[in-house]
Amino acid sequence: MAEARSKISFEDALVELEQIAEKLERQDFSLEESLKAYERGMELKKICRGILDSAEGKIEALTKDESQKTNKTGFRTESKSTSQTSSDSVLEEDLF
């Protein structure tokens, strides 16, 4: 059952979590129901956090990958002699 619950989308989990929070604030539950709702809320929070962490990791990887591509292609030089390429490297280091 927990496996099926973890397949919930971020948006659906967030909506359900907000509904639980509203009901708990209005005290629409008995104590036993409140504890079950709190437990479900914590489960939903964990699911949302996992989805957000995964998305953040993907964004960081894409950003890092794009940054590396920019660095690799941003300083390409055309065929030059070794001495000229060395002096270009020094200038690039001085600039950055």
Curated annotation (Swiss-Prot):
Q: Which domain of life is it from?
A: Bacteria
Where does it sit, as one GO cellular component term? cytosol
Q: Does the keyword Transferase apply?
A: no
According to its UniProt record, where is this protein mainly located? cytoplasm
* UniProt-listed Gene3D superfamilies: Exonuclease VII, small subunit (1.10.287.1040)
- BP GO terms, sorted: DNA catabolic process
Biased composition range(s): Low complexity = 80-89
Q: Where is the composition biased (Basic and acidic residues)?
A: 61-79
What reaction does this enzyme carry out catalytically?
A: Exonucleolytic cleavage in either 5'- to 3'- or 3'- to 5'-direction to yield nucleoside 5'-phosphates
Describe its assembly: Heterooligomer composed of large and small subunits.
Q: How is this protein named in the record?
A: Exodeoxyribonuclease 7 small subunit
Organism this protein belongs to? Leptospira borgpetersenii serovar Hardjo-bovis (strain JB197)
Organism classification: Bacteria, Pseudomonadati, Spirochaetota, Spirochaetia, Leptospirales
**Quick one: which gene encodes this?**
xseB
